[in-house]
Design a protein with these regions (language model features):
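Acidic-aromatic/histidine active-site loop/patch
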Residues: 91
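Histidine-centered metal-binding segments
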Residues: 2-23
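Functional-site microenvironments in short loops/helix caps that host divalent-cation chemistry
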Residues: 10, 14-15, 51-52, 58, ...
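C-terminal, low-complexity/hydrophilic appendages and adjacent surface loops
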Residues: 64-73
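Long, low-complexity intrinsically disordered regions
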Residues: 22-25, 31, 36
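A short N-terminal beta-strand-loop micro-motif at the entrance of redox/enzyme domains
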Residues: 75-82
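GGW-centered surface loops in extracellular recognition modules
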Residues: 29, 40-46, 50-51
């Protein structure tokens, strides 16, 4: 996800208002679900785990494509203790167990609106609030939430093993509280996503991502962005979490498919001053 501002990155919408982007990030908003009870630690987290060994790596962009405004620079050494991480993102089926057990309502449900990519909107005209500022391919849709990812005319039918979407940082933390889990730090996430490889472009190495060698390795855009997606990899929206091949640590689709939350706040200058050993993330910044 991107920080709010005049120059959004990663093709994501800035949070200009509740009306346009209920589930995106800016300066961390106050949670709207203070009354929700998640019965901390009571949930069944039924996602397989990957053991990630302790080690050191160079964190940040090493290809020259990174953006300082996105907090991808400078390249710096990080050393981590061993930890475990989910092999996949949380699925719709797993998030439904949480919501059904607790009665939890996500922030998108409480706001009554969220941002939907324009090719994926399934909603009556009256529900369309309009494009988000700076990224008009994201449309504010009233009634869009995790149960209705494209809007009120959509559902989770056939999507139980797809990753849950329209989930804010606060929602992710509430799920973790119920499941007796935690979000990974950004350092843990990047280390795990690399799958034990160093000085390569992707979690699988330097082979192309786009199927030019006959093999698709992730769910990414194909075609002319943002107008036409050829869906050459098999998916125009999200893909089931066990699609493609896992990396060296056993993580499925650590790139592509969906954005994923980390525990850290966002501060574009943090890399320049973060500690080498188990960096916890900045004390201040947006989420």
């Amino acid at each position: 996800m991107n920080p709010a501002g005049e120059s959004p990155h990663c093709c994501g919408p800035s949070r200009a208002s509740d009306e346009t982007a209920a589930a995106t990030t800016g300066a961390a908003p106050a949670s709207r679900h203070a009354a929700n009870s998640t019965a901390g630690g009571a949930g069944l987290h039924a996602i397989e785990q990957c053991a990630v060994p302790a080690g050191s790596f160079l964190m940040g962009d090493s290809s020259g494509d990174g953006l300082a405004a996105d907090g991808e620079l400078p390249l710096h050494r990080v050393t981590l203790e061993t930890f475990e991480i989910d092999a996949t993102p949380v699925t719709n089926a797993q998030f439904a167990r949480f919501a059904d057990a607790t009665g939890y309502e996500t922030e998108a449900e409480l706001f009554g609106i969220s941002a939907v990519f324009h090719l994926l909107v399934e909603a009556p005209t009256a529900d369309i609030a309009g494009p988000t500022s700076g990224t008009p391919w994201w449309i504010g849709v009233r009634g869009a939430d995790w149960r209705h990812p494209g809007g009120q005319a959509s559902s989770l039918e056939g999507r139980s093993e797809h990753p849950v979407v329209h989930v804010s940082w606060h929602d992710a933390m509430a799920y973790c509280d119920w499941a007796d889990r935690r979000l990974p730090t950004e350092a843990e996430w990047e280390y795990a996503a690399r799958g034990g490889l160093t000085a390569v472009t992707f979690p699988w190495g330097d082979d192309p991502i786009d199927g030019s060698d006959g093999v698709w390795r992730a769910n990414v855009w194909q075609g002319s962005f943002p107008a036409h997606n050829t869906a050459a990899d098999g998916w125009i929206g999200t893909a089931p979490v066990h699609s493609f091949e896992p990396n060296g640590y056993g993580l499925w689709q650590p790139v592509g498919n969906v954005w994923e939350w980390c525990a850290d706040r966002f501060d574009p200058g943090y890399y320049a001053e973060s500690p080498e050993f188990d960096p916890p993330g900045p004390e201040r910044g947006g989420r």
